[in-house]
Amino acid sequence: MKKIILEKSTLLTLLVTSGVFMGGTCVFAEEPVERFTLGEFVVTASRVATNKSDTPANISVITKESIADNNYSDAAEAISKIPGVNVLGSGAKGTSMGQDKILINGDERVLILVDGRRVNLGSSGNYSADWLPPVNAIERIEVLKGAGSALYGTDAVGGVINIITKKGSELESHVTVRAASGSWNTEQYGITAGGATENGLGIFVSASKDRRGNYSYKDIDGDVKTMPNSGFNTDGVNLKLDQQIGKDNRITMQFEHLNTEGGAPFGYYGITTTDKHKRLNNNLSMRYDWKESTDNSGYMQIYRNHHHAQFLSPDKDNKSDFIDSTWGVDLQQSFKLSEKNNLITGISYYKTEVNNDVMFDGKKEIDNQAIFLEDRWKFADSWQLNTGLRFDHHSTYGSELTPRISLNKKLNEDTNVYLSWGKVFKAPTVQDLYWKQNMPYEYNGVWYDSWTLGNPDLKPEKGNVWTLGTNTKISEKTNFTASVFYSDIKDAIAWKGNSNGAYQAFNVAKEKRRGMELSINHYFNDNLSGYLSYTYAKSERNDGYGYVNYDNIKPNIYRAGIKYKNEKLILNMDLNVVNGQVLMYTNGYDSYGYADKSYFTLDLGAQYKINKDAKVFIKGYNLTNARYQEYGGKYSNGEAKYPMPSRSFIVGMEYNF
């Protein structure tokens, strides 16, 4: 980006404009995490590199430059800035044994990939944002919003997030150290080293440590209190080796390690001060790519993901110790059939074993075999048609075909319009099928059973997802994107109370989701940029008695921000407004809700580059000191079950050797 002087009048204009837009019912927006350019290449939408203007999908990209400029603490913070993506945090790391849930377009059925390798758990089908690779190891993040089942399979109903990590062979030799400290005894440390040897072996290694004490939150009376038992301690190591073989072939080995433990304060009936959680993740993969710089590229990879989680409690009925282990193999080949026609095909197999005596009465297994193909046909100079088909054979539910059709029209070099339809198929998880656990509780001196039950008679979820969108470059300094989506799912799986008082998985008749995303990104000059965004999502389910709201998670999100950058200094301001949350809504037999209908947060960041190798930074979060929650749920007194942190700060530095 070029450099010129910050104009005070321009800054004031943006602030006033942001306030006007957020006061209405609709805002146009885009986060600075993605600047739309027609020449940008992405891989997640089609499993191979394609020009974004020829990609009929709603896809966002976070670059390593954006990660560095914003000094994100982790990948969860980075992806939470993307319109259409929600990361549901709890303030502590102890919700549901440490899971910060990721949603796309209001849907939690999201597939998470690391360098194209699936990492979702077989037990829950999810993957916590807390477990993603550290930001110092990330080259870029691609987010596909909309169904990806035809290419990626059963978990990709709401979308796909692909974390692409750095390769040592593509880096200059370096060592980078980072340290930060902040509120609630926060300490963050990271070190990365990478480069290539004389014989071309690429080496990249990163190590990180993140720990924090008990955090503070604002309660229902407006008082700031400390959440007991909410501290955590996390260590991680990532290693990636890659070696080019010949001109266009490459072999890559990768290892990811994560060890985390902390308090779990969020009990169903109140705050707990003794429950703890621990988790160990060890993932290993090997991949061979051939003809990687050609139109006839392909690869084969084998992998093993190992997760060991423990929930520790003085209450023996509330303990849990489980292992979730998946091994798999992927094979993919692309073909250039003609100048206007490309085909990609592949096979995939994975097997998951889950062992938990408390939750599943021992070991459970599922496996899935699949073959897929997609044809990309430019049938005219400005038209492209993508047609795809996937065949899955699930060990429990047999065979299923999932087609996808996408149409892209390039109106000119600065604008494209796309329409995409996909059939989705989502098999129940091990947790949905086999969970069986009793957690007795005491109320007024009387003990009651509290069962959580899976349902082996569940049907798979099936349905359709539609996306219509456009990307356009209004001017040399202004980019605009817009999209709408709609999904209808039959036999959607929901957890709710049954007639015997147990919490159980059921198929509901129908589920509908609809929403929109509007975004604008403007560059006032070569130093100053701004963005505005609005996203809307609504989820409804019909149990045979009419549609009712379901989840009601952040139905309206307004975001705005500005960024100033010159050779030495970077300043960021991010505004976030959520409204439309329901204080009380029903989900089958159960009631949920939020302590507040709306909230407003403000984050500020500053970075100063001391020299070419060193920088210092400071960030402030929730400077409005708002009371808010991202997971729904209230206690009987109206207090939020999962309050998010109050105002906090972090200060750090980074040095390159």
What spans do the regions from the language model cover?
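Gram-negative outer-membrane beta-barrel transporters
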Residues: L343, K378-Q384, T481, F485-D488, ...
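N-terminal Sec signal peptide and the immediately downstream disordered periplasmic leader
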Residues: M1-Y72, A76-I82, G194-G195, D235, ...
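A beta-strand signature from Gram-negative outer-membrane beta-barrel systems
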Residues: V135-T176
